[in-house]
């Protein structure tokens, strides 16, 4: 079994889905069975699959990859239901409720010009609610409709909001029924014992600069561990030689409030940059741009990789070369892409569909 891990190196939106899809494509072309594991965050991903954008399935779905939600992934049942996704789910995944979404958005609005940078998906509110056992809701509870309804009523008492408008119980129960009938709630290693997967792709959300341990940027962080922390023990049971893919654009972006390394204007990079997924929105505002501090980038990659006990292969992936004439836009000006000593291989991408080796 081969294990590959795709990690964003910056503030997210680096091209993790593109990288994951290419790994799946190459595996599928060799006839391998593939499982992609989402191991942090929630349905914040924006994967283009066919002519649509999906938040709940792997980018490698088009290449036959199954999708699994790790126990540290926070599931939004409503999104799963609306997108009619078919996935495997760890029984201990925490769940996002409609009231979590509204709570997150209400609090973020109230912050005015001191926003934390929420995506408005309800992740932080769900994580905070889960700290209280009586209000925590886990994926395996979706399989018992009666107990689920009673738990929802109890959570209603925790949130002083109108039940019918905010909690949307009917839709949530429909989502639970959909998941019970169309998805499978199963522990990770139980799934592996029943399926002969040859390639496991762990795909992270967000980027290392948003990791909850990066206290220099608090509170403008995601409430999850972005790098290897959540999955290192699982990986060590599977292999001693995982392939790690740390992804970055040839410049840096940030969508949302908070400090940013070497921020600059889009025009300083390329005024013609078009980002179809990261459009201006109420919660994150306009996409922001910056230059790469290579020393900082390489340091955080090596720090994350050192968490793994074994001999991982560290690879770099640089995307969006088409906007920077094949160069890195760094704090020291434009630079050629050169493989650093700690790195095994460097991959590049100049379009939306393919990643190439150099």
Regions of interest found by a model, annotated:
Residues 1-358:
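Non-transmembrane, aqueous-exposed alpha-helical and coiled segments at domain scale
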């Amino acid at each position: 079994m081969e294990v590959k891990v795709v990690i964003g190196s910056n503030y997210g939106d680096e091209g993790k889905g593109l990288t994951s899809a290419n790994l799946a494509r190459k595996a599928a072309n060799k006839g391998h069975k593939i499982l992609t594991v989402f191991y942090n965050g929630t349905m914040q991903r924006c994967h283009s699959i066919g002519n649509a954008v999906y938040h709940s399935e792997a980018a490698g779905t088009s290449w036959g990859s199954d999708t699994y939600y790790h126990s540290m992934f926070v599931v939004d049942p409503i999104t799963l239901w609306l997108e009619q996704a078919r996935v495997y789910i760890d029984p201990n995944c925490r769940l996002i409720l409609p009231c979590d979404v509204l709570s997150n958005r209400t609090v973020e609005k109230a912050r005015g010009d001191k926003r934390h940078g929420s995506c408005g998906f309800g992740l932080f509110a769900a994580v905070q609610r889960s700290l209280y056992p009586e209000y925590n809701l886990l994926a395996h509870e979706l399989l018992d409709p009666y107990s689920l309804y009673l738990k929802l009523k109890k959570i209603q008492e925790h949130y002083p909001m109108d039940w019918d408008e905010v909690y949307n119980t009917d839709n949530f129960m429909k989502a639970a029924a959909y998941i019970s009938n169309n998805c499978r709630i199963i522990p990770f290693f139980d799934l592996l014992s029943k399926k002969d997967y040859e390639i496991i792709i762990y795909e992270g959300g967000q980027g290392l600069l948003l990791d909850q341990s990066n206290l220099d940027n608090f509170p403008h962080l995601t409430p999850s561990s972005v790098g290897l922390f959540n999955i290192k023990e699982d990986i060590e049971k599977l292999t001693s030689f995982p392939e790690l893919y740390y992804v970055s654009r040839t410049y840096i972006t940030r969508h949302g409030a908070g400090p940013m390394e070497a921020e600059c204007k889009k025009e300083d990079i390329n005024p013609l940059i078009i980002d179809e997924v990261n459009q201006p929105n109420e919660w994150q505002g306009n996409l922001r741009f910056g230059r790469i501090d290579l020393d900082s980038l390489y340091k955080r990659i090596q720090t994350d990789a050192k968490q793994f006990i074994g001999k991982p292969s560290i690879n770099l992936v640089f995307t969006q070369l088409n906007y920077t004439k094949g160069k890195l836009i760094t704090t020291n000006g434009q630079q050629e892409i050169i493989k650093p000593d700690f790195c095994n291989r460097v991959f590049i991408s100049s379009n939306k569909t393919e990643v190439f080796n150099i």
